[in-house]
């Protein structure tokens, strides 16, 4: 007899910022058990699925998750009890129907995704398969190129940088293991450079350094210096990726680069700034270079820069097929950031990736700034065929857990493993 869902139990835990989040434990009738812990973001798109919080100012500043936990235990659990866990799409659709809203605001995406991921993880364990093989099929053997955050700014750090993330991509590495070596050596080189220049080497939410630099340009200069100091060739071995998170400094139609003192800019002027940077630095990817509602700006942005680099939509698209389809039709990007908790189920996330593939777009599987030790996204990245993964710096164990899981997967795959796009 095939195993069925026997119990579903949620509880509140804490993420990497000490903020409450949801953990779900799901047990099958064959004794298999699996858990899923859900992350949360600091910079969130206004069209994301709703992360349900309690709103009680007397507890965790209103950020408690007891409502979401209760929704799992009292609403979702009775509805999914007795169902077969490999019916992932059916279970996800059932939870969407139980919620009954367009953005999962009644039950909460944090509640629904916790169950969705736990169902997949339990089904894989029951089948005796690694999660990546269960979700993607036996032929999936491609490891993603990591986008590794080494300098933090914006909402992720208290620094003078307007832009949220400055990342490195080990594009010239022959394997994921070597990519991690390239990255860790560059990270340590940057740390020594910052120390020598008298900067603090404390880190931000995602593990990147957060020094008090004079400008966004200085951040890129330091990264190039670190790549070279580590013995690598900028652009050949290691490239740069940016996530300005431009919505965070966009006010009344103007981009205000106030932290770095670079003044106010229009959408066109921001695109021109990026164009100059691409000519000056080995930048291969820009995510959220403009604000989440600046669709006209993004069309120009992609028309000007899209032949040279990857233009990634995050807040603009929020892992939602409706917005991704619009962006494909309007040529507003050429890649999508994929966040499971932006849309709220495994099934809908897979559908978003299939739409990207159909359009010939790239995709980046992403963490959130408030993470947990859960490694679901690492397996998910391999299951979806590699692409790219963005899961923070080579620092802080909630980030390293994902990288170490990918190293384990590459080792298990042996000679069958492939790396990169």
Swiss-Prot record:
GO terms for cellular component: cell surface; extracellular region; phosphopyruvate hydratase complex. Binds a second Mg(2+) ion via substrate during catalysis. It is found in: Cytoplasm; Secreted; Cell surface. (2R)-2-phosphoglycerate binds at residues 164, 339, 368-369, 390. Its EC number is 4.2.1.11. SMART domains: Enolase_C (SM01192), Enolase_N (SM01193). It comes from the Bacteria. CDD domains: enolase (cd03313). Keywords: Cytoplasm, Glycolysis, Lyase, Magnesium, Metal-binding, Secreted. One of its GO terms (molecular function) is phosphopyruvate hydratase activity. The keyword Cytoplasm applies. Pathway: Carbohydrate degradation; glycolysis; pyruvate from D-glyceraldehyde 3-phosphate: step 4/5. HAMAP family: Enolase. This is Enolase 1. It comes from Methylococcus capsulatus (strain ATCC 33009 / NCIMB 11132 / Bath). The gene is eno1.
